[in-house]
Amino acid sequence: MNGIVLELQKEAMDKNADIESLLRKSYFIARKLKLPEFEEWIQCEQEGYGKKETPEYRMIQGQLKALNPVRGWIPVVMESAIAEKAFTKTKLPNSVSELYDLYQNAESSMLVMNLPAERNKYVAKCCGFNTQFRLEFGKNQIYSILSRVKNNILDWALTLEESGIVGRDYSFSEEEKKIAQEKTEITNYITNFWGTTTDVQVQQLSLIHI
């Protein structure tokens, strides 16, 4: 029987692999190897990030639109690149299961995110007119987030193998556990997920079809 790390690699390369199953198997491996930071990342992907820092790969960009009483939803033109970044980019802290459901149940290629009340009030003040605002974006951006999670798992599993960690059935030798603790490319692996820190808004996504 192949080691569990090799199993994980094979499953992560399968385009039809269940992402939650991949996360559970990754959590099992991380727990066995005593890699708490990677465990925490997996739990955040499973349960959502909440108030914790959300990785850069969960960034989406859309088009900000305002509700015009006569013309309906119209694009909002920004006066500066800074304002455009602030109002058209956001990070999605939702769990992967929520994101997957949103992607699967989308009735069109576009999704809509209504702005929270306080955020809407702030945008209205900046734009100079009081109305309802929303962000429209392609559902392919949700797919990109899910794909990135799978790629992270695959790359992590390859890093383990390259370091001599493959497991025997569903257990690891003391030598493999020692390697996992001593190699910084393993213990610090999740630093690859964050990239350059930004001050972009983080917003929970609930689906509206257009």
Question: Where are the regions that the model predicts?
Answer:
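N-terminal interaction modules that seed assembly of large macromolecular complexes
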Residues: 17-72
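Charged, amphipathic alpha-helical oligomerization/scaffolding segments
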Residues: 7, 14, 18-21, 25-28, ...
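Function-dense linear segments that define catalytic or interfacial modules
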Residues: 202-205
